[in-house]
Amino acid sequence: MKIVIASSHGYKIRETKTFLKQLGSFDIFSLADFPDYYAPKEIGSLPEDNALAKGLHAAKELNSWVIADDTMLMVPALNGLPGKFSATFAGEDACDKDHRKKLLQEMQSLESIVDRSAYFECCVVLASPEGKFFKSRGICEGYISNHEKGSSGFGYDSLFLKYDYKQTFAELSEDVKNQVSHRAKALQKLTPYLQDLLEKHLVSRN
């Protein structure tokens, strides 16, 4: 069964592909396979808004079931920032390293783990070409390190430590991160719907 990951981000694609392959025989594509596709701009204030907009748009345009997601990093001491600005915190054209640098600057005066607490919130949407959709949410709580650690992952991974872990997301192995991350939690909640799709696809083929 064909399914499209509504992302061109290599790490997101790899993480979602790993999850899907564990479930069964999906024919997995991503937006990298559709160079002429134009993705809508992310303007939502919640991960759910962006994931739903991305998923429904891609499913209709590509005539395929689609998995889309959106993630935001929230720091309560910064009134929820970066939040909806997670991907543009240091500016529209800034890179991940610039965003991390700005976050560290904003948190310079915060010393305790309590003050540096943060959480990732991820929404994943499974959408059909006809506009049907299922959505799930995953949250991972932790805190922001006072310096970068690790070289894996992307975004704010090298700054974020999950509670009860001594390593940042950028230091964890992919296997471990794929079990405990916000995206992993959201994807796991979609398992029954994905398995149902596969079963119906196999029945229709027979």
From Swiss-Prot:
Catalytic activity annotation: XTP + H2O = XMP + diphosphate + H(+); dITP + H2O = dIMP + diphosphate + H(+); ITP + H2O = IMP + diphosphate + H(+)
UniProt enzyme class: hydrolase
EC assignment: 3.6.1.66
Record: residues binding Mg(2+): D70
Taxonomic superkingdom: Bacteria
NCBIfam families registered for this protein in UniProt: RdgB/HAM1 family non-canonical purine NTP pyrophosphatase
Subunit structure: Homodimer.
Family: Belongs to the HAM1 NTPase family.
Protein name: dITP/XTP pyrophosphatase
Organism of this sequence: Chlamydia felis (strain Fe/C-56)
